[in-house]
Each structure stands twice: as structure tokens, then as C-alpha cells.
């Protein structure tokens, strides 16, 4: 399992997106790739709620990059429910659909799980890659985005080979 831990408000994560998309398309079949929004505090919870709401509505593929662009190109803060809904409404999502998912037990549970895993994996910065719950991409061998991807592939192969 390979998890990309990211934050929509993180400029490095936005810049890393091209690399991680390429990784996702070219990863080995044995790699189960997932994304997880980091949850450091209440502001990050709101951002995680956006991710899991988009996922539950089946529009994450479209919304993921749109949310990044809203932060980094349009300079939106995305801190209020109404501002977030505005972005979702551009995809044809009604206010009722949005509110039912945004405040749902399922979305809240996933946000809480992301918060627990943020602590468990000792995430201090983003983007961070977690391989099999054991290894993270922080350290002297990962100075560039390409290094992060290379180390991720090596660690995933190591874990797969040790089974």
C-alpha cells in the first residue's frame, strides 16, 4: 500500500501532483495507491472534508485538481462551507446533495481516520508518501519529487518481495 499524504493548501503538493499522477498511471500492479488529506487541525479537517465529499459523490477524479487550482491559481481560502459548495456546484452538485455528503457520518468517519493516521505516521510536512504503514518519504535521500517517487518504488518493491 502506498499513500500520498497531501494538503490542498500546500504549494509543494500542488507542484507534486504531476509526478504523483504519473506514478499512479505507471505503478506496478501490486501497489495499492491511495491519497489521504493530512489533518493537522480544524482548517485541515475542512479541506479533508472536501476530498471525502468529492469521493463520496463520485467526482473526485474531476474535483481533486479543481480544488488544488482553486487554492493556488484562484487564491481561494476554501474555509467556509458556502465557498466550498460554490466549487462543487460548478460540477452540477445541488445544495442538498452537497450538504448531505459534506456533513455525513461516512465523510466525518474518513476525516477522523485521516486525523488518526496523520498522528500515527507522524506526518510533519506534505507531501509525504507512506509505504505499507512502515516507511515515509522524509529524509536525506528524497530531495526532489523524482527522488520521492524513486524511493517509493524501491520501498514498495522491497515490501512486496518480502511477502
Q: What are these model-predicted stretches?
A:
Residues 90-163:
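C-terminal cap of thioredoxin/glutaredoxin-like
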